[in-house]
């Protein structure tokens, strides 16, 4: 006895149907969805029978608009990998049915917007962002329509505004009533190279050049305009700083300390070969302190020091042959070494035997005899081998002149 594959009962009818290599009652061969009798053609999935429409509706390609199956006889439209019914392929904003070949914009992979609605929406958003970014400007003027000759007057102002905006980021959350800044623009390395090359060619580009840069870099023209303003302001600040640094370098590095003294001295007063010569040709700014002569605070440099003869009074204060310090400035009442002053003979006199009728001053040479240099033998037979003006013996009583020690 043959049993039906659908109802599992024996088949007693005169006719039967053979479907999927199994016997069926004629009334049992029907669609499992719509229950219609299948006489000519049927579709099966997982042992179930379907009519053509229900099979493609359940297992065929789904419409991206209504999420329903698409029948093979239906007309469809394709956008990328999506398939739509003709009635489902519409603009999400104006619900206009999109035709073949029409430009459209895809949002969230399954939402489509016609070109007119997209451009209108983008222009509105751009105007809002520009209005929020350009605070305090006239809204009737477009930023790209301004004359490039006005850029210089706005360079420092835009730089200050950028600094103020950067410093006020922390207070944005607190000032809820104030307008918030527009979106920050990040310039990539390739875009930055293009802008730097354009700035090197023309620091003040015209609107036509800015439009070309906007097409090349993909940046907004307002962003490019502000970048050029800030870059010009930065270049001016760098030039000012470099000029100030050059002036400071020239002021501090020039040897000016000895110029007024050289101009005031006569040519005959300089004795480059004497033991107490004036170092007018020395170009250094500083002198090293003397080793043992405290009343000469500054000593001559070793390169141009004149070494006098070994004097007896120098044995107690330092090694023989130590040069005396150079006098840096001429003082009133002090004569240059050309007038035959003998410092050893002056120091040999005690304070009470000074030929000068003036009272002894604390800074005079008369009071510095034995306290500074210690005991010394008489200076009767020693002479200074320095120059022609120092050939006289130190035993001669010199003409004393009052002078303060420098």
Swiss-Prot record:
Write down the CDD domains for this protein, in alphabetical order.
homeodomain, LIM1_Lhx1_Lhx5, LIM2_Lhx1_Lhx5
Annotated InterPro entries = HD (IPR001356), Homeobox_CS (IPR017970), Homeodomain-like_sf (IPR009057), Lhx1/5_LIM1 (IPR049618), Lhx1/5_LIM2 (IPR049619), LIM_Homeobox_TF (IPR050453), Znf_LIM (IPR001781)
Q: Which residues fall in a compositionally biased region of kind Basic and acidic residues? A: 151-167
Q: Which Pfam families match?
A: Homeodomain, LIM
Q: Using the UniProt record, give the first listed, main subcellular location.
A: nucleus
User: Any stretches that span the bilayer, and where are they?
Assistant: none
User: Origin, by domain of life?
Assistant: Eukaryota
Low complexity: bias regions: 137-148
What subcellular locations does the record give?
Nucleus
UniProt keywords, alphabetically: DNA-binding, Homeobox, LIM domain, Metal-binding, Nucleus, Repeat, Zinc
| UniProt biased composition (Polar residues) | 125-136
- Mention any one GO cellular component term assigned to this protein in its UniProt record: nucleus
Biological role stated in the UniProt entry? Transcriptional factor that defines subclasses of motoneurons that segregate into columns in the spinal cord and select distinct axon pathways. Acts in conjunction with ISL-2.
Its name, as the record gives it, is LIM/homeobox protein Lhx1
Can you name the source organism? Gallus gallus
Q: Name the gene.
A: LHX1
């Amino acid at each position: 006895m043959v049993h039906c594959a659908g109802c599992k009962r024996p088949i007693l009818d005169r006719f039967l149907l053979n479907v999927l290599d199994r016997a069926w009652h004629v009334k049992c061969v029907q669609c499992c969805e719509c229950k219609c009798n299948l006489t000519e053609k049927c579709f099966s999935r997982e042992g179930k029978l379907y009519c053509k429409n229900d099979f493609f509706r359940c297992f065929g390609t789904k419409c991206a608009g209504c999420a329903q199956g698409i029948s093979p006889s239906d007309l469809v439209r394709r956008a990328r990998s999506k398939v739509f019914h003709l009635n489902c392929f519409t603009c999400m904003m104006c619900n206009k049915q999109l035709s073949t070949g029409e430009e459209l914009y895809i949002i969230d992979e399954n939402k489509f917007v016609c070109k007119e609605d997209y451009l209108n929406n983008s222009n509105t958003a751009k105007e809002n962002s520009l209005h929020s970014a350009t605070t305090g400007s006239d809204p009737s003027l477009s930023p790209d329509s301004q004359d490039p000759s006005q850029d210089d007057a706005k360079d420092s102002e835009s730089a200050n505004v950028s600094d103020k905006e950067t410093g006020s980021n922390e207070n944005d959350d607190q000032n809820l009533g104030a307008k918030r800044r527009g979106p920050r623009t990040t310039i990539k390395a390739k875009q930055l190279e293009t802008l730097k090359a354009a700035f090197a060619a023309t620091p003040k580009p015209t609107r036509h050049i800015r439009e070309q840069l906007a097409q090349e870099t993909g940046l907004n023209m307002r962003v490019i305009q502000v970048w050029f303003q800030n870059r010009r302001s930065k270049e001016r600040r760098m030039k000012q700083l470099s000029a100030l640094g050059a002036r400071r370098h020239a002021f501090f590095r020039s040897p000016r300390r000895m110029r007024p003294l050289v101009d005031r001295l006569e040519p005959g007063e300089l004795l480059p070969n004497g033991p107490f010569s004036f170092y007018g040709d020395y170009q250094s700014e500083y002198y090293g302190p003397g080793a043992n002569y405290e009343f000469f605070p500054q000593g001559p440099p070793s390169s141009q020091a004149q070494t006098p003869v070994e004097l007896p009074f120098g044995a107690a204060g330092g090694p023989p042959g130590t040069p005396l310090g150079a006098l840096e400035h001429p003082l009133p009442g002090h004569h240059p070494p050309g007038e035959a002053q003998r410092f050893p003979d002056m120091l040999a006199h005690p304070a009470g035997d000074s030929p000068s009728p003036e009272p002894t001053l604390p800074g005079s040479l008369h009071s510095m005899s034995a306290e500074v240099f210690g005991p010394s033998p008489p200076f009767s037979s020693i002479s200074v081998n320095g120059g022609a003006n120092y050939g006289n013996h130190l035993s001669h009583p010199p003409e004393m002149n009052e002078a303060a020690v420098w």
